[in-house]
Amino acid sequence: MSDRFVATDADGLQHHNGHRRRWPLPVLEAGGWRPGDVVEPDEHGTPVVLDADQLLDELGECVFLAEPAGEAGAARLVAATSWSEKQAAAFALDCVEHILEIVPGSAEAELPDGGSLGEIIASARQYLDNGTSTDTHRLGFVSRIAAARRLRRESTAIGDAAFTAAAQAEGQGVDIMSDPAWETLAAARDAVLAAVEAVRHVAFPFLAERETRRYEAHEERKVAEVDQVDTPWGRFAVGGAGPKYAPSWVAARDAAERSRQAAADLNGPPAGEAERSWQVGRLVERLRAE
């Protein structure tokens, strides 16, 4: 039987089909992992464990190995995988690099401020691997476009003036990337934007931690005034009302999904399924990374 997984937040809370379930976490001891306590079926049904293909659509902050235990339908977490913010961003880049090799002309497609999709992904990979890049300004520009486009796509009300101003400042780039000339490369473009968002989350964990908790809680209430934080990628707004940046695992899901769509757009549904199969294999490699 292949491995089974459970995706949770850092506290062991799983979100699945509108239900939340708390899993006791395994503990790493000197002799190896001590499994968490068994989770029994409840009023919401049996505990949900996933194979690697199912996990691709339900990536979370943490991913644990799980196994059946006790009565029928019960399960427990037995060990953590190697999944992390950095592995999520690396997986997003894996998906995008693979699809840029497949879709003709996608790697050479130019960004609003110059450069190409292929170049920005190479810069993002360099930053993720080495913590530095010669193209940090463009990485920041693209990550802000990514956030603004996602908020526009989700019809999310941006509830504070500071972030609204920041989104407007990137507005020209957002609009240019909506131009009909991008139509045939739309899915590849969106995959690139999602991957850069994932790397931004890793690059600046002090932003990521705050936004991650807000994203998980779906906070909408007014909180402390917005902070403008200067980083090597430029200025970012944090705080205010509502989450503004997707966590790295959400961006990784988006990058994978849009990469599959790019393959399907090019060569039909079987190509999208083939891309999914490749992604599942790569995801398992990331989960097992040392």
Predicted regions and their residues:
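Short, glycine-biased loop/turn motifs at secondary-structure junctions and
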Residues: 1-290
